[in-house]
Amino acid sequence: MAVQKNKKSRSKRGMRRSHDSLSTPQLSVDSTSGELHLRHNVTADGFYRGQKVINK
């Protein structure tokens, strides 16, 4: 098992943990259907930026 030789400071611990935070997903409203969707993703209806891109 790995054991550290010297104690890590609070500053170094904080620097390591600075990338661990979670961010909320960026949502957009489609101009055609008014549906919420993730940014840069096609809606469930097949619309992207107001245009139909997927035909079911």
UniProtKB/Swiss-Prot annotation:
GO MF terms, alphabetically ordered: structural constituent of ribosome
Residue ranges with Basic residues bias: 1-16
Bias kind Polar residues: ranges: 21-34
Cross-referenced PANTHER family: 50S RIBOSOMAL PROTEIN L32, LARGE RIBOSOMAL SUBUNIT PROTEIN BL32
Protein known as: Large ribosomal subunit protein bL32
Entry's Gene Ontology cellular component terms: large ribosomal subunit
InterPro entries per the UniProt record, alphabetical: Ribosomal_bL32, Ribosomal_bL32_bact, Ribosomal_zn-bd
Family per similarity comment: Belongs to the bacterial ribosomal protein bL32 family.
Gene Ontology biological-process annotations: translation
Alphabetized UniProt keyword annotations: Ribonucleoprotein, Ribosomal protein
Location of region: Disordered: 1-36
